[in-house]
Amino acid sequence: MSIAALFTWMITILGGLILLVIWIIEYDREFQSAAATRLPVPVISAHALLAMGGLLFWIAYLLLDEERLAWAAVAILGTVAVLGLIMAARWIRVYRSFAAPGPSLTRSTTVPPERNFPLPVVVAHGILAITTLVLVLFTALGAGGS
């Protein structure tokens, strides 16, 4: 189960990196202002950095078999999940409001960069994140062995 958690964590980070690259490209290309995005830059940064840092704790746990490293990874991953939920809630509002062009959308309307996220990537990232959290938590609790 611990190796499965490692793989799901790495795939989840890969999906997150895809979303981050899309966001950076779109943000840099057209918007140049913090008001253009609905996702707080500190939340995006903390989410990404903590996810990678937590993965390092998980790898250290796998190598050293120290239970406290597993619990540190659980705590970090829990924080990452909360930040992810904050971003998901904000992204859903953007996705819905810009899904179908209506009378409120004109050529001058600024579309946030996160509107360009591919829906399948966002959904897969979320499902993998939940799966990773469950696997990491169950492994830390001792279910399924190492």
Question: Where does each model-flagged region fall?
Answer:
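Transmembrane alpha-helix entry/boundary detector in multi-pass membrane proteins
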Residues: M1-T8, S33-L49, L69-A73
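N-terminal signal-anchor/start-transfer transmembrane helix
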Residues: A5-E30
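Membrane-helix exit/interface motif
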Residues: I22-R29, G53-E67, M87-R90
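Cytosolic, membrane-interface loops and tails of multi-pass inner-membrane proteins
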Residues: E26-L39, S97-P113
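Core segments of alpha-helical transmembrane spans in multipass integral membrane proteins
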Residues: P40-I59, A75-L85
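Short alpha-helical packing/oligomerization segments
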Residues: L63-Y95
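Individual transmembrane alpha-helices with interfacial aromatic-anchor signatures
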Residues: V111-L128
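Juxtamembrane boundary at the C-terminal end of a transmembrane helix
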Residues: T132-S146
